[in-house]
Amino acid sequence: MSDLKKAAQKAIELMDLTTLNDDDTDQKVIELCHKAKTPAGNTAAICIYPRFIPIARKTLNEMGCEEIKIATVTNFPHGNDDIAIAVLETRAAVAYGADEVDVVFPYRALMEGNETVGYELVKACKEACGDDVLLKVIIESGVLQDPALIRKASELSIDAGADFIKTSTGKVEVNATLEAAEIMMTVIAEKNPKVGFKPAGGVRDAAAAEEFLGVAERLLGKGWATPRTFRFGASSLLNNLLHTLELAEAPKGPQGY
């Protein structure tokens, strides 16, 4: 198997197959669940809005794919600085049955010089998740832009108990970049290599996935990237990976997140 095919295979195993669109329906989520069971193996998780968790759980159970995790989003997509609301949303997501919660860090507050609210929000949301539900913190690196701010958001999130740090919501112009990945995984290497990293949005094909995995290997070592420490947040990427593995036709038309 070529290096590119190996990267494609690994990226599928590390994928949070995502639909976070305003026009999502039960039917679209059911279809997403079926896509997550690919000819090359299952994706690590699906990522959906909280209201769809029950139908997703039912569908995955019926498929015999209970091992596919269900991730959802809170404080999404704007990263407001109201801790109480973020915690209520996170508690509700856990009550719905989420295995993982992707919460948006209050990145605009950080840009205005407030470091405290981000730390406190992540800490409170991790408490709401408990030990059994993973908390991934979206820092919106494409809006932060400044390397010092990307570093600070990563540090605050890890200090507050994040299980993962994630680049992006996929709802802004600039999503996952290799530059942000470098900074974020450097912080992970310095602070706690058990914390995971999730590039989301903008990873379009196997070659791009291979580049992100290359950064992980260089900074954190061969074998570090497993579903417990690395995820790709993506929707259109899956078809490209299956095409690379010669298991699907080439994708047609404009590609999403």
From Swiss-Prot:
Catalyzes a reversible aldol reaction between acetaldehyde and D-glyceraldehyde 3-phosphate to generate 2-deoxy-D-ribose 5-phosphate. It is found in: Cytoplasm. GO terms for biological process: 2-deoxyribose 1-phosphate catabolic process; carbohydrate catabolic process; deoxyribonucleotide catabolic process. It is an enzyme of class 4 (lyase). Its EC number is 4.1.2.4. One of its GO terms (molecular function) is deoxyribose-phosphate aldolase activity. It comes from Shewanella loihica (strain ATCC BAA-1088 / PV-4). Gene3D superfamilies: Aldolase class I (3.20.20.70). Pathway: Carbohydrate degradation; 2-deoxy-D-ribose 1-phosphate degradation; D-glyceraldehyde 3-phosphate and acetaldehyde from 2-deoxy-alpha-D-ribose 1-phosphate: step 2/2. It holds the Pfam family DeoC. Its main location: cytoplasm. It catalyses: 2-deoxy-D-ribose 5-phosphate = D-glyceraldehyde 3-phosphate + acetaldehyde. The active site is at D102 (proton donor/acceptor), K166 (schiff-base intermediate with acetaldehyde), K198 (proton donor/acceptor). SMART domains: DeoC. It comes from the Bacteria. InterPro entries: Aldolase_TIM, DeoC, DeoC/FbaB/LacD_aldolase, DeoC_typeII. This is Deoxyribose-phosphate aldolase. The gene is deoC. One of its GO terms (cellular component) is cytoplasm. Keywords: Cytoplasm, Lyase, Schiff base.
